[in-house]
């Protein structure tokens, strides 16, 4: 069984098609990097998997839960809630609650959504903070943290829900350059644990070295995909080669 399976996904904004019948399959334990120019549909695809965007057509399957976007999503609310409990999402701009401490941010999902005992969720949150290198920051507020620290809290928050898959939407693009490495190292650690992840990123070296598979998108379509190292070393499609040209010359 696939961890994620997307079939014939179509998304439009104001009548303009931004995803043209996308098919995507992600296996359990696979790390997939999605690359491509700005406006190519990468983030829209990622947000559609979690139904943060409502597609016009297509099916989205995570584990054994399938959403048919041709049907009214209001009639599938229970299924969508179930799907979201299986999918962690790490946003570009962290999306932490500013008026809550680090610990409160992490335990909210497990306690409110999943009904876990607060003591159990708190113990797990402390473990996760240690895992992402932020032990001792439990009572800090987001505004007191650097961007890199906030993003690592956001990763811990996603992990706290024990998701089957984690989606990362350009997790380093809002960070100062010197803070990028600490977040990438955290994601690299998760990849080594064989967690199922889909990562939209502009960090080409990271995508090549960490992902099992790379997908190049342009103008709302998947142009090319394959083993990450092979795609970066010798892309088959001229458009992929053009996009990667500067990187390949380094």
Swiss-Prot record:
<dbReference type="GO" id="GO:0005524">
    <property type="term" value="F:ATP binding"/>
</dbReference>
<dbReference type="InterPro" id="IPR027417">
    <property type="entry name" value="P-loop_NTPase"/>
</dbReference>
<keyword id="KW-0067">ATP-binding</keyword>
<comment type="subunit">
    <text>The complex is composed of two ATP-binding proteins (TcyN), two transmembrane proteins (TcyL) and a solute-binding protein (TcyJ).</text>
</comment>
<feature type="binding site">
    <location>
        <begin position="36"/>
        <end position="43"/>
    </location>
    <ligand>
        <name>ATP</name>
    </ligand>
</feature>
<dbReference type="Pfam" id="PF00005">
    <property type="entry name" value="ABC_tran"/>
</dbReference>
<keyword id="KW-1003">Cell membrane</keyword>
<dbReference type="GO" id="GO:0005886">
    <property type="term" value="C:plasma membrane"/>
</dbReference>
<keyword id="KW-1278">Translocase</keyword>
<dbReference type="InterPro" id="IPR003593">
    <property type="entry name" value="AAA+_ATPase"/>
</dbReference>
<keyword id="KW-0472">Membrane</keyword>
<dbReference type="GO" id="GO:0016887">
    <property type="term" value="F:ATP hydrolysis activity"/>
</dbReference>
<dbReference type="InterPro" id="IPR030679">
    <property type="entry name" value="ABC_ATPase_HisP-typ"/>
</dbReference>
<dbReference type="InterPro" id="IPR017871">
    <property type="entry name" value="ABC_transporter-like_CS"/>
</dbReference>
<comment type="function">
    <text>Part of the ABC transporter complex TcyJLN involved in L-cystine import. This high affinity cystine transporter is involved in resistance to oxidative stress by forming a L-cysteine/L-cystine shuttle system with the EamA transporter, which exports L-cysteine as reducing equivalents to the periplasm to prevent the cells from oxidative stress. Exported L-cysteine can reduce the periplasmic hydrogen peroxide to water, and then generated L-cystine is imported back into the cytoplasm via the TcyJLN complex. Functions at low cystine concentrations.</text>
</comment>
<dbReference type="GO" id="GO:0015184">
    <property type="term" value="F:L-cystine transmembrane transporter activity"/>
</dbReference>
<comment type="similarity">
    <text>Belongs to the ABC transporter superfamily.</text>
</comment>
<keyword id="KW-0813">Transport</keyword>
<dbReference type="GO" id="GO:0055052">
    <property type="term" value="C:ATP-binding cassette (ABC) transporter complex, substrate-binding subunit-containing"/>
</dbReference>
<keyword id="KW-0997">Cell inner membrane</keyword>
<protein>
    <recommendedName>
        <fullName>L-cystine transport system ATP-binding protein TcyN</fullName>
        <ecNumber>7.4.2.12</ecNumber>
    </recommendedName>
</protein>
<dbReference type="GO" id="GO:0015811">
    <property type="term" value="P:L-cystine transport"/>
</dbReference>
<keyword id="KW-0547">Nucleotide-binding</keyword>
<keyword id="KW-0029">Amino-acid transport</keyword>
<dbReference type="InterPro" id="IPR003439">
    <property type="entry name" value="ABC_transporter-like_ATP-bd"/>
</dbReference>
<feature type="domain" description="ABC transporter">
    <location>
        <begin position="4"/>
        <end position="244"/>
    </location>
</feature>
<dbReference type="GO" id="GO:1903712">
    <property type="term" value="P:cysteine transmembrane transport"/>
</dbReference>
<dbReference type="GO" id="GO:0015424">
    <property type="term" value="F:ABC-type amino acid transporter activity"/>
</dbReference>
<dbReference type="InterPro" id="IPR050086">
    <property type="entry name" value="MetN_ABC_transporter-like"/>
</dbReference>
